[in-house]
Amino acid sequence: MVVRSRGVCAALALWWFSSAAQAGEHDVLALARLWSEVRATHPALAAGTIDWDRALVAALPHLEGEDNQNSLRAAAVTLMAPLHDDALRIGASMPAFVRWPVDGAVLEWLPGDTALLHLHPGMRAAAAPFVLPVRARRVILDLRPIADMSYMSSPAMLQVSLHSVLAQLIVRPLLPPAPRYRFSTGPRPQDGGQWEGVVPGFMQMETQSLLPAPGARCLPLAVIVNDAQPVPAAVLALQRAGRAQIVTEEGVRRSRAGPLQTLWLEDDLPVEFSAGQLAWPDGSAVRWQADQRLPQDRATGQGSAPVMAALALLARKPKRHKPAASPAMYPLRQDDAAYRDMRFPPRAWRMLAAIKLWATMDKYFPARRLMDHSWEEALLACLRRMEDVRDAREYGLALEAMAVQLDDSHVGTGSRALGWNERTHGIGLRLARIDGRVYVAGVTDPVLEGSGLLRAGDEITGIDGEDVSTRLARLAGKMAASTEAGRWRKAMFEMTLFSGGASVRLRLAAADGVQRSVTVQPTSLDNALPLRHALPAVSVDEGVAYVDLDRLQPGEVDAMFATIKDSRAVIFDMRGYPNGTGRALARRLNVRHAASFATSYQQLAMPYEAGHGAQLAYEDRLFPAPGPLYRGKVVMLIDEHTQSQAEHLALAVEAATPVTFVGTPSAGANGDLREVVLPGNVHVWYSGLEVRHADGRELQRVGVQPHILAAPTVAGLRAGRDEVLERARQFLRQDQG
């Protein structure tokens, strides 16, 4: 994307699509970018009364066959129509500018001591501010540009010049309307009880009072504008106060006021639309009206139609009036429609699904810069697949394949056609991948364990007649993951899931190499994490405490510290998922007196001029401990199962106390789980926040790194040993010595 500044406009080019797009695809991608930008920022979409999904579906049929600018223009017109945006302009036309020299005189005297001030954007700025002569009894300001302002002058400089003149024409402070922008932050967290960060809404910027200049006089004032530049906010305030009258001359396009943004569908096909609003102090939005409208006439100076119209307005006393204003905007929460009635959506709706997934991640996925693959190319590939999919399952698989490219272990894709309501049972096993082979790390189903059919250290070589390496590779290709270890972990878990009532035949190899086959019955899944071993959740042995954070509950934290208070060291086992104990734990460990332990980043989509592509940063705070601090040595066990809340807990402990991490890198996927719902009730989950260490180091796709690397071995599994825990104990013995 290329951004070119145009004063109050931002031009967003789409050239980066072209290299990957095939014939006919560039126009679809250009329309997708327009749909995405409007969806994220246009003020008309705040109230939820416009079906923006359906608007894209209505526009897409214009784009059949080869790329064609007329078709693309027609698609853009159809797409933007529901917005009823008075600022909308589609297509470039050669602008007609006022005919006045770049270095022409600023002041021209008209009859009746009327000062015509040529403040045309595009004129060379004078070294000193213009001082209105005492002779002036009436004033006309001609603010129409004489040149394209994209590259000529700074909008800020133009405002300074205008304000210096207006300050000489007011006798009390003037309050211009303030710019107000809509911003969006993407879908809400999957768990409605979670902290959401900043929710979508409006951001109103400050405005600045215009103060009278020394010796200012309240003179009759008329202002000439046209359709080439937005009407300045200060002029609108003067009109509202009855202190100015406005003449506009315009052609097919109407004059406008308020923030604008421009997105270029092609080099010569811009779409310009509202970037926000101007708001009065009561919250209502400006809807400006000229005191007189004229047909397009770019002439200026004495005898020109616009100047004559301004003189006619000055001949009669202006009335104080209040131009029409729109009611204050009232943004409403908008959740994605599920479209459950279209299990296998028609082609246009399938295209919408791919575009919506792309747009959501393009705007709101905070770790997009860390992806290995081009997200634009992922969209192209998915759009091509949408042409050929034959049923709801193939449709879901196409979206799943696209989402995999996000490289985020939180990412998952689910729908009925993909079997999310069918795989309700699983084999009660913990698996480990060692040197490319899959081994039983533990049997968690008591019935299966009692049967003796499987033992820790057994190699699984086949499942239901399929070679396990083949099955695992196939499943791994469907897994989005922050790290390769995380990809294999997710694939191995998926490998143990089955529908209810199934019988599963496993081919096994024991330590002696003897092959055997066993048949097992998957059991109903629940949310309980399997026990790693028979150790108590909290124990102390020879001065070293052990705490299983999978089992520790929030209400048990203080009692746990009371139990271990006399230990010289503690091993926290975080090779699983905690129960919301992170802050309570870190507070009692905070010998470093840390005030915060992590920073979370949330994407903020808003118009370019208001801060396009901004990120919000939040510090996770640590508060004073409710009890005595634990000052012993701290070790934490981690591995690829340490994900999300578990990683957050690790960051909290890391900030609070000198901790030694033992094990293998964590999953590298932290940040609350969010979801986008696509046509056909397809859900895609992803990390809604990017979380970093307190010192700013990356966590996403990196994970918490162990100080001491330790991993299970095949021999250790077969001997029933927990080698990671053993390594931690060994470290503490060495440290004691």
Language-model features, listed with the residues they occupy:
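Bacterial N-terminal signal peptides that target proteins for export
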Residues: 1-9
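Bacterial N-terminal signal peptides
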Residues: 9-19
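Boundary at the C-terminal end of the N-terminal hydrophobic targeting segment
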Residues: 21-23
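Conserved PDZ fold ligand-binding element
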Residues: 34-42, 59-64, 117, 137-144, ...
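Cleft-lining beta-strand/loop regions that shape enzyme active-site pockets
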Residues: 36-39, 47-48, 64, 93-270, ...
